[in-house]
């Protein structure tokens, strides 16, 4: 076994180093940042992680407390090695690390907790390099475009950083500037990770994370094209124009390129900042409802989904005139377009999950590629235990014990989870990531798995399925029947929501006390 590891790692090192010399030899490269050093970091980190898992768990009986304890320690060490690698190699490595860190209910918590810092601690590009990118892309000096330009970025991410600035006419803008080396590095980094993951799979056949690389291959070119991001922002703004609470920054196309995006500057607090909301008298429950309504509309009705809703990309503020909370949605580089068949099956699956219809859960989970692992798939989608799925996920909130059980199961069922992620449609992968990010926000706000979120989802599913049926029918009577059924279902949901609000309100408490008094008086 040891010889096999050495042989695989050596083969990976030789092939990567030679491919690195070939690739980097075709352009400008700095050996201290790319080349042998960059490849060497990744190879050595992968070898160290692989060796740790093999040697530490070799002589311990699986399933015992000792095994679980040692495995957790190995997870922790490996996660920190990955974090160090991502921070050293930057760019694409940070992007992939962020993706893993967002899968809170799908990978062991040692990884998600460690890698989640990448959302807020990405390295910055030095200001002279930022100026150079603007000069190259806009063909002007920075002083010709802006009267003010803050050197310190508002925030830095894996692919770019954002600066606050003021245009010559006085308009405040946010300027997103791509890290200068990311474009050249991205394809090479993906090749590097792909070869390393293939090497690891030779040693651990149950290791099924090639889907992560396939997603990066597909999405990175889109995320690196800021003109595509601008088009996504405008499309989303048009799709959900009926939502008065949503704000999407306007794009200034005359100053935007594939590497520079100039947009309207909007201020607000991060959506998970409860203290900010309290200071500004923003209703937390109203924010949670609005966010759930927005994403239900994206996923179930339109099939056009913003897939990076981490707290830095979702801001909140109070409208000074209406005193209604507003959501500001930023960073429109990563979207998932759902096919109609996938979207409708996903609608039907969520309706089954909310209704605790086990037969329909099995049918639609299998249609979405889960096979006989459909119970695990249902748990992954809802972040609930199979027992809660059977009882009805809307009937009770997540207990502390259930939350701990779910997190521990992410480690226990990692081979099965990775098998599922490799078998479901590619569209599902970004939805799972999006679900986990939204759940993280709900948990921060203390509104996790609220009934209102399920009501929003149910409404959107009813509307989406009814619209599809109406489009497919040629019969006027059938069209009327579908419309009446839709109206009836939406009416039921409206009544249920009123009952829930009454139960939670002072009026509800008063009615309950009156009913108790009447009951005691009669008896």
Swiss-Prot record:
Top-level lineage group:
Eukaryota
Q: Where in the cell is it found?
A: Mitochondrion
List the InterPro entries. ABC1_dom, ADCK1_dom, Kinase-like_dom_sf, Mito_struct-func_regulator, Prot_kinase_dom
Single GO molecular function = protein serine/threonine kinase activity
Active-site annotation: 308
A cellular component term, taken from the record's GO annotations? mitochondrion
Enzyme Commission designation:
2.7.-.-
Where the record annotates domain Protein kinase, the positions are: 148-484
The yes or no answer to whether the keyword ATP-binding is present is yes
Q: Which CDD domains match?
A: ADCK1-like
User: What function does the entry list?
Assistant: Appears to be essential for maintaining mitochondrial cristae formation and mitochondrial function by acting via YME1L1 in a kinase-independent manner to regulate essential mitochondrial structural proteins OPA1 and IMMT. The action of this enzyme is not yet clear. It is not known if it has protein kinase activity and what type of substrate it would phosphorylate (Ser, Thr or Tyr).
> What does the similarity note say?
Belongs to the protein kinase superfamily. ADCK protein kinase family.
> What's this protein's name?
AarF domain-containing protein kinase 1
């Amino acid at each position: 076994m040891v010889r096999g590891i050495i042989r695989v790692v050596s083969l990976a090192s030789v092939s990567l180093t030679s491919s690195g010399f070939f690739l980097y030899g075709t352009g400008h490269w700095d050996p201290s940042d790319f080349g042998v050093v960059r490849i060497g970091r990744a190879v050595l980190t992968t070898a160290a992680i692989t060796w740790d898992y093999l040697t530490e768990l070799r002589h311990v009986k699986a399933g015992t407390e000792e095994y679980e304890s040692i495995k957790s320690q190995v997870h922790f060490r490996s996660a920190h090695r990955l974090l160090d690698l991502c921070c050293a190699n930057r760019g694409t490595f940070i992007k992939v690390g962020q993706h893993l860190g967002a899968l809170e209910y799908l990978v062991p918590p040692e990884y998600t907790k460690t890698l989640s810092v990448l959302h807020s601690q990405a390295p910055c590009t030095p200001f002279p390099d930022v100026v150079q990118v603007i000069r190259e892309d806009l063909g002007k000096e920075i002083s010709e475009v802006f009267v003010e330009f803050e050197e310190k970025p508002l925030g830095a991410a894996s692919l770019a950083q954002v600066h606050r600035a003021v245009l010559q006419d006085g308009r405040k803008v946010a300027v997103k500037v791509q890290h200068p080396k990311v474009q050249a590095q991205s394809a090479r980094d993906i090749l590097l990770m792909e070869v390393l993951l293939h090497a690891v799979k030779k040693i651990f056949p149950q290791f099924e994370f090639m889907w992560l690389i396939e997603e990066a291959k597909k999405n990175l070119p889109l995320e690196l094209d800021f003109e595509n991001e601008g088009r996504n922002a405008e499309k989303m703004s048009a799709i959900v124009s009926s939502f008065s609470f949503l704000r999407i920054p306007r794009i200034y196309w005359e100053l935007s390129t594939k590497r520079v995006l100039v947009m309207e500057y909007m201020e607000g607090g991060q959506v998970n900042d409860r203290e900010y909301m309290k200071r500004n008298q923003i209703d937390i429950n109203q924010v949670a409802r609005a966010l759930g309504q927005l994403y239900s509309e994206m996923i179930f009705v339109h099939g056009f989904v913003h897939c990076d809703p981490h707290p830095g990309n979702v801001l909140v503020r109070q409208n000074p005139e209406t005193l209604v909370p507003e959501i500001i949605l930023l960073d429109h580089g990563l979207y998932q377009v759902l096919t109609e068949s996938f979207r409708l099956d996903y609608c039907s699956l969520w309706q089954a999950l909310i209704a605790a219809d086990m037969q329909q859960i099995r049918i639609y989970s299998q249609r979405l590629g889960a096979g006989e692992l459909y119970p695990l798939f249902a748990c992954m989608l809802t972040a609930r235990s199979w027992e809660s799925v059977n009882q009805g996920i809307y009937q009770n909130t997540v207990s502390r014990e259930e939350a701990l059980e779910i997190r521990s199961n992410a480690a226990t069922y990692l081979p099965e989870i990775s098998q599922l992620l490799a078998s479901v449609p590619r569209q599902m992968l970004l939805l799972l990531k999006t679900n986990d990010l939204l759940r993280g926000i709900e948990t921060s706000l203390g509104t996790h798995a609220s009934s209102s979120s399920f009501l929003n989802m149910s409404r959107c599913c009813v509307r989406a399925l009814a619209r599809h049926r109406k489009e497919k029918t040629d019969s006027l009577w059938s069209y009327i029947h579908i419309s009446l059924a839709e109206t009836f279902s939406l009416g039921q949901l409206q009544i249920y929501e009123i009952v829930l609000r009454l139960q939670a309100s002072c009026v509800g408490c008063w009615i309950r006390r009156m009913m108790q008094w009447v009951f005691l008086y009669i008896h």
